[in-house]
Amino acid sequence: MVYAVVRAGGRQEKVEVGTIVTMDRVKNQQSGKVVLPAVLLVDGDTITTDAAKLADVTVSAEILNDLRGPKIVIQKFKNKTGYKKRQGHRQDLTRVQVTEIN
């Protein structure tokens, strides 16, 4: 069993071949593929965490689609002044599927 922990959009995700990961929006989408940097690699009983060895490891993923996350509401309130502020936010996301771990 081969799996890797990759850095995807500011977070770390445990992935195998075929895993679908939702991460922050990927800007460069012309090719439809993205390479994720590996932080840890497990190949059977062998665990690799050395940065020099992980520089040779590539985790390739195919971009499936772009989407937007759920809306969150931010509210500010100050007592006794009548100050209220309400703001919403939806994060831009990209869904990718891991195609290979080399």
Curated annotation (Swiss-Prot):
Top-level taxon: Bacteria
InterPro entries linked to this entry: bL21-like (IPR028909), bL21-like_sf (IPR036164), Ribosomal_bL21 (IPR001787), Ribosomal_bL21_CS (IPR018258)
One GO cellular component term: cytoplasm
GO molecular function, one term: structural constituent of ribosome
Pfam families: Ribosomal_L21p
One of the GO BP terms on file: translation
SUBUNIT field: Part of the 50S ribosomal subunit. Contacts protein L20.
Biological role: This protein binds to 23S rRNA in the presence of protein L20.
NCBIfam families associated with the record: L21
Annotated family: Belongs to the bacterial ribosomal protein bL21 family.
Record protein name field: Large ribosomal subunit protein bL21
Gene source species: Clavibacter michiganensis subsp. michiganensis (strain NCPPB 382)
The encoding gene: rplU
